[in-house]
Amino acid sequence: MKNPKPFGVVAGFVRLHKSSLGQARYYSIPNDVSIPASKRKFIPSSGTYPKGFLVACAHAGVKESNTQFPDVALICSETPCSAAAVFTTNKFQAAPVQVSKQVLEKRQGAGIRGVVINSGCANAVTGKGGLEHAKMMSAKVDECNGTPSTGPQDTSTLVMSTGVIGQRLPIKKILDAIPTAHSNLASTHSTWLATARAICTTDTFPKLLSRPFTLPSSPNRQYCLAGMTKGAGMIHPNMATLLGILCTDVPISPSALKALLTHAVSRSFNAISIDGDTSTNDTIALLANGAAGGEAITTTSSPDYAAMQTILTSFAQSLAQLVVRDGEGATKFIMVRVCNSPSHADAKVIASTIARSPLVKTALYGKDANWGRILCAIGYAQGIAEGTVVPERTSVSFRPVDGSAELKLLVNGERKAWNESRREDLADEDLEIVLIWCRQKGEKGLGGGGGVVLVCDFSHEYVTINGDYRT
């Protein structure tokens, strides 16, 4: 990429005014300030990236206020690859979601060349014109790859958009920017990082990870997995509210790739929540080009598949954690853990209900051990098996991550007295809420299920950010 700008100095669309509530937060990518000091530790200083994948970004000016910084991104494979994706469950699915689904269905997950993303406009609820714009973006990348499509239904590039809903894309600007980005395709760490930054909206830092690994069939062959994601608000499980692109140079068939992604997403991106809202655009895509060679993964019963499933799931969980750590206005990263539930499904529903409770989240922001709000959320959880929640067997505690003693709030349905000096434990950036159902002696019906959901707190600044989003 030619002279990429430092990612710490990036496009700013709106600046929040400073107030007595604390330091101003910059959203739609920070303006002329560096990434917040507390977030810099999450930005990798180097990376190992999969063979055969090239990335780049360019400025289009999707938002008129953005006069110079990248807002169009490309992730391209030098050869056709297998691809799979998981999409938003929102019924108002954005044009890029619909087009990407069509591309994958028509090609049956094979022969995909990459992904094009724009930030600044979601291209959602934009009618037939929005669909045409998404198809034009896909076709333009194919043209740049030297494999022009024969028609709008024959493209090989997935499309993603993020930003304000209900507005049309400035499509000419984007189509002009795509060749510029394509001419700068590269595989350097700085280019991957700049591309991860180009897809951001309210994020305060680019979310990028990479990981080398081996597989049982080729213990001496190095494979790589890289991924970038964006999201800081409108985040809730069920493939809700974020974009993510994962790439690997392992040879994997489309059917095996889909199974791998579905498993990984259910335990990562579908197990996080920031504000309980589900977006119109969210997509997680996984591309595998096989450029590193070796034995192809074609079935779900092979040792390589099992190893890849573990690696991919762990990797996706790490990416998902970055999204929660960058929650809009967040001051805390919270793990809600449910233990001894009759089933994993029930445990996940209960953990998710706690995670999306505004009262629980505001109490955590205020460093208030208000376990009554946690119990309230447990009590109204929907869709769980009868008898799952037994008040007199319910225990709730806070578990500091620094290894200090667990703060027990409720034990077998009885309030547990605790020292107010432990209140300082609630000021920690990381905290775990543990919910346990106690099994009676000799009983075999409980203890089989557990679930974890990641969430952040609600602060004054979340309201400020979203109240000012379009102003």
UniProtKB/Swiss-Prot annotation:
Swiss-Prot/TrEMBL GO biological process terms: L-arginine biosynthetic process; ornithine biosynthetic process
Q: In the UniProt record, does the keyword Acyltransferase occur?
A: yes
Name the Enzyme Commission number(s) assigned to this protein: 2.3.1.35, 2.3.1.1
List site positions: Involved in the stabilization of negative charge on the oxyanion by the formation of the oxyanion hole: T162, G163
Q: What does the entry list under GO cellular component?
A: mitochondrial matrix
What Pfam families does its record include? Answer: ArgJ
Entries under CDD domains matching the protein? OAT (cd02152)
* Catalysed reactions, semicolon-separated: N(2)-acetyl-L-ornithine + L-glutamate = N-acetyl-L-glutamate + L-ornithine; L-glutamate + acetyl-CoA = N-acetyl-L-glutamate + CoA + H(+)
Q: Which SUPFAM superfamilies match?
A: DmpA/ArgJ-like (SSF56266)
Q: What molecular function does GO assign, one term?
A: L-glutamate N-acetyltransferase activity
Which InterPro entries does the UniProt record give? Arg_biosynth_ArgJ, ArgJ-like_dom_sf, ArgJ_beta_C
List ligand-binding residues for substrate: T201, K230, T241, E328, N466, T471
Misc remark: This protein may be expected to contain an N-terminal transit peptide but none has been predicted.
| Functional description taken from the UniProt entry | Catalyzes two activities which are involved in the cyclic version of arginine biosynthesis: the synthesis of acetylglutamate from glutamate and acetyl-CoA, and of ornithine by transacetylation between acetylornithine and glutamate.
Family from the record: Belongs to the ArgJ family.
Self-association and partners:
Heterodimer of an alpha and a beta chain.
Q: What is this protein called?
A: Arginine biosynthesis bifunctional protein ArgJ, mitochondrial
